[in-house]
Regions:
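N-terminal signal-anchor module of multipass membrane proteins
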Residues: 1-53, 57, 312-318
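Alpha-helical transmembrane segments in multi-pass membrane proteins
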Residues: 25-33, 48-60, 77-82, 86, ...
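Structural signature of hydrophobic alpha-helical transmembrane segments
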Residues: 42-55, 92-101, 171, 175-185, ...
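C-terminal ends of transmembrane helices
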Residues: 58-70, 106-117, 188-199, 241-250
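Membrane-interface helix-loop-helix junctions at boundaries between adjacent transmembrane segments
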Residues: 77-78, 83-149
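Long hydrophobic alpha-helical segments that form multi-pass transmembrane helix bundles
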Residues: 117-189
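Loop-to-transmembrane alpha-helix initiation sites
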Residues: 120, 124, 228-236, 257-259, ...
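Conserved mixed alpha/beta catalytic, RNA-binding, or beta-rich assembly cores of soluble enzyme
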Residues: 196-223
């Protein structure tokens, strides 16, 4: 009797990949962005990545040790969170602030909700948003590659009124101000290609998000070039590839992924063009995370052969 088949409605998810294997692939995919940050902004960028990652791992280990929970440091999820969180900061960020962000991401967002698989939103995303809301001036102190790390806040491509004046190659290669992980489009695309090639993620969500922003921006501005610059600027690409695709907080059905991608792209566009902020990707992903159960429900496939029960006629025999 122990070998009975369990019959349930679709979708049926079959995957032999381990959490450690999947997270390991994400770490590898993030390496081009880490190396690009080091080349563009210098050694301090690598130090910030290392400290933030170590802090995330340490907080996870200490929390599980104190509460006598199974140790999950080996699944590399804390490492992924640390790298993504660090790449969502400007290079001049004080290390103690990075540690605070790591605490918010690991302890508050992840562990207090039950650990990996139970968090309501991407931990690194929440860490970024909390730091941005509490330390806006620090989080927007962008540094150009040829400036000192203690320079004052500088404009990013999103803040430039006439984006047609921006050199496409400079934006693509990362010769501009911004968060460490978002400036080099080439590095992000290399990571994206690796994730898709290894089937760690599907291309549906990132492509849908970017396509939505591109189309809406082109229609609103009347310029495909401006739309292209906007898609390559800010946290759109980095967020679409590495944050919106989080396994726990993104839909698992194909239709659900499409709804989710369009929703995030739409909210990002609305915040950028009609809100008070230049960037809206983080808030769009957070709202998308919260909407994921509904996207899964809307995208749920009806089981083969399913027939909707007929309503009993009034006054009929019971």
């Amino acid at each position: 009797m122990e070998d009975r088949l369990i019959v349930t409605a679709s979708p049926h998810i079959r995957d032999t990949s381990t959490t450690r294997g999947l997270m390991g692939n994400v770490v590898i995919a993030l390496l081009p962005a880490v190396l690009a940050a080091g080349l563009i902004f210098g050694v301090q960028a690598l130090v910030l990545v290392a400290v933030t990652t170590l802090a995330c791992v340490a907080f996870e280990y200490i929390y599980e040790k104190l509460l006598k929970k199974p140790n999950t440091v080996g699944d590399l999820s804390a490492v992924v969170t640390g790298i993504i969180l660090a790449l969502n900061m400007p290079v001049g960020m004080p290390l103690w602030i990075a540690v605070v962000g790591a605490f918010v991401a690991i302890v508050i967002t992840k562990q207090l909700f039950g650990g990996l698989g139970y968090n309501f939103a991407n931990p690194a995303l929440v860490g970024r948003i909390v730091l941005f809301l509490g330390l806006t001036s620090r989080m927007t102190a962008y540094v150009y590659p040829d400036m000192a790390v203690d320079a004052l806040a500088s404009a990013t491509p999103l803040a430039v009124a006439d984006k047609t004046t921006l050199p496409l190659l400079d934006v693509f290669l990362g010769f501009r101000g911004g968060m460490m992980g978002e400036v080099c489009v080439l590095a992000i695309l290399l990571g994206f290609a690796y994730l898709v090639a290894t089937r760690t993620i599907q291309a549906t969500i990132p492509v849908t998000i970017v396509a939505t922003v591109f189309v809406l921006t082109a229609l609103n501005t009347g310029s495909a070039y401006t739309a292209l610059i906007e898609c390559m600027s800010g946290g759109l690409l980095f967020g679409a590839v590495f944050m919106a695709t989080d396994y726990v907080t993104s839909p698992f059905t194909t239709k659900g992924k499409l709804f989710y991608g369009v929703f995030i792209g739409l909210i990002t566009f609305l915040i950028r063009h009609f809100g008070s902020m230049n960037e809206g990707m983080s808030y769009a992903i957070l709202l998308g995370n919260l909407m994921t159960p509904w996207f899964n429900a809307w995208g749920h496939q009806t089981p083969l052969g399913y027939k909707k029960p007929k309503k009993a006629k009034k006054g009929g025999a019971e």
